[in-house]
């Protein structure tokens, strides 16, 4: 292990690592130790597989928010034998003390809170570059940026014109980073792609990208959709957002949520948790939805289902949770009331048309909180520049719910790494018995005791006594 330098500049120049401040490592380790007590699933996997080392030989390129909870995930992967390199999947989501704690133990980590887009793509490249000149054989992704980088870079090796017309600021920096890498090594991406056995994807947005590639025949390796494990989407997306959304709004603005008019755009699992979060603090919550089933669910829960255009001048708080593109556009932004709070809890920053605000007057209040003066003279408060508010303005989901998600991630990595030949170039989900196992590992921590089926009862409903108890198509 290389002796740890003391500044980000030294880290950039001297070691296989980029973090903000190694002096934060002790603080990060204290929080990491506390988080472990709230993450029983990951601790159980360490106990079960620690001696066996099922991930020995795995080289995992991780692109996922560099938080304290992620630090516990990283150390679990390493305990199970993996060699890991890590970057954050969002420019604002890194917790610098978490990155320092991981770096202090010798793991190559490339993550700083408040990265530029140029740095973000440089760091994402670094997780694909092993110090011995080798490549990763596994990707652990959140949002699909690492996977997408490898695939787009491979296309660019054959036809550089695919990088000619970036459609937004993010693509401008992405395309430039690929061109720079190709100038250094013209076959880097194809070699990397050939080495990868599989990818496990954490979030709704990244899963959508995987299914799109599968449909077009462009998916070059097997993928496991971790997001659609029940113990991920129905827990992380719902209960995690229920706690972390209002935490981030309160930290950023200190406003009283009670009595405010709030609009949640999108009523999937993330939207459901967000709506509960705001209602729980006393806001009057409305929902905007395109899906009639989700809209009916919202109405049956007592929310008003409205069109954004009809209420945009009435709302105090706007939250996007759709995974879609330009949901709140300039035509909506300019009509907002004075001091309206605007934020996003979907993965990417393009749910809100932040680019259309660049020519207006911006007044930075504090990191990730901006006052923007509209042509009307009204000011809006934009949080985290339209990126993930719960990680940009707070610390994300609590450790316990992330243990559910990350236990699925570890199981998915083991599955693909140890059984690579059993999977084709498609998107898969973990089998039901593993989903139930993840839930079972978390029950005792919160004092829950399962009832057991008798053999006669199990036979009556035609399930094994030990489960699984529901068919794959069951909707929880």
Curated annotation (Swiss-Prot):
CC annotations in GO: cytosol
Binding residues for NAD(+): 203-205, 237, 266-271, 289, 324, 345-347, 390
UniProt xrefs under PROSITE patterns: ADOHCYASE_1 (PS00738), ADOHCYASE_2 (PS00739)
GO annotation terms (biological process): L-homocysteine biosynthetic process; one-carbon metabolic process; S-adenosylmethionine cycle
Enzyme Commission numbers on file: 3.13.2.1
Organism superkingdom: Bacteria
GO molecular function: adenosylhomocysteinase activity
Pathway assigned in UniProt: Amino-acid biosynthesis; L-homocysteine biosynthesis; L-homocysteine from S-adenosyl-L-homocysteine: step 1/1
Cofactor section: NAD(+)
Purpose of the protein: May play a key role in the regulation of the intracellular concentration of adenosylhomocysteine.
UniProt similarity note: Belongs to the adenosylhomocysteinase family.
UniProt-listed PANTHER family: ADENOSYLHOMOCYSTEINASE
Protein name, as recorded: Adenosylhomocysteinase
């Amino acid at each position: 292990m290389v002796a740890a330098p003391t500044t980000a500049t030294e880290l950039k120049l001297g070691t296989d690592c980029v973090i903000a401040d190694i002096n934060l490592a002790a603080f990060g380790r204290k929080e990491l130790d506390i988080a472990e007590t709230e993450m029983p699933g990951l601790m159980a996997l360490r106990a079960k597989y620690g001696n066996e080392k099922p991930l020995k030989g795995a080289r995992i390129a991780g692109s996922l928010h560099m938080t304290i909870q992620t630090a516990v995930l990283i150390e679990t992967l390493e305990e199970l034998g993996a060699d890991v390199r890590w970057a954050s999947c969002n420019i604002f989501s890194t917790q610098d003390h978490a990155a320092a704690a991981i770096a202090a133990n010798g793991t190559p980590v490339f993550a700083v809170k408040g990265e530029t887009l140029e740095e973000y793509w440089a760091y994402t490249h670094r997780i694909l570059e092993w110090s011995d000149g080798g490549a990763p054989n596994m990707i652990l992704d959140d949002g699909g940026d690492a996977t997408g980088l490898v695939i787009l870079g491979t296309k660019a090796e054959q036809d550089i014109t695919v990088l000619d017309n970036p459609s937004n600021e993010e693509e401008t920096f992405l395309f430039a980073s690929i061109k720079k890498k190709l100038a250094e090594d013209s076959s880097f991406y194809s070699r990397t792609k050939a080495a990868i056995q599989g990818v496990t994807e954490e979030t709704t947005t990244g899963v959508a990208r995987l299914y799109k590639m599968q449909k077009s025949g462009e998916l070059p390796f097997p993928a496991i959709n971790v997001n659609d494990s029940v113990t991920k989407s129905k827990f992380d997306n719902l209960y995690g957002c229920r706690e972390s959304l209002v935490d981030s709004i309160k930290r950023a603005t200190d406003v009283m949520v009670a009595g405010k008019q709030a609009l949640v755009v999108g009523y999937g699992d993330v939207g459901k948790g967000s709506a509960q979060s705001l209602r729980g603090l006393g806001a009057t919550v409305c929902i905007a939805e395109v899906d009639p089933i989700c809209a009916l669910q919202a109405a049956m829960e007592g929310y008003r289902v409205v069109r954004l255009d009809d209420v945009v001048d009435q709302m105090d708080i706007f939250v996007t949770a759709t995974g879609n593109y330009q949901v709140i556009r300039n035509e909506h932004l300019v009509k907002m009331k004075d001091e309206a709070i605007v934020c996003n809890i979907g993965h990417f920053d393009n749910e809100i048309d932040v680019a259309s605000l660049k020519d207006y007057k911006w007044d930075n209040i504090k990191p990730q909180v901006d006052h923007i003066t509209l042509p009307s003279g009204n000011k809006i408060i934009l949080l985290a520049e339209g990126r993930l508010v719960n990680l940009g303005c707070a610390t994300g989901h609590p450790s316990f719910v992330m243990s559910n998600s990350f236990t699925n991630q570890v199981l998915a990595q083991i599955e693909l790494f140890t059984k690579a030949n059993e999977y084709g170039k498609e998107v898969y989900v973990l089998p039901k018995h593993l989903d139930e196992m993840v839930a079972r590992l978390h029950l005792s921590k919160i004092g829950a005791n399962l009832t057991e089926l008798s053999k006669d009862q199990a036979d009556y409903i035609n399930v094994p006594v030990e489960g699984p108890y529901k068919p794959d198509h069951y909707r929880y």
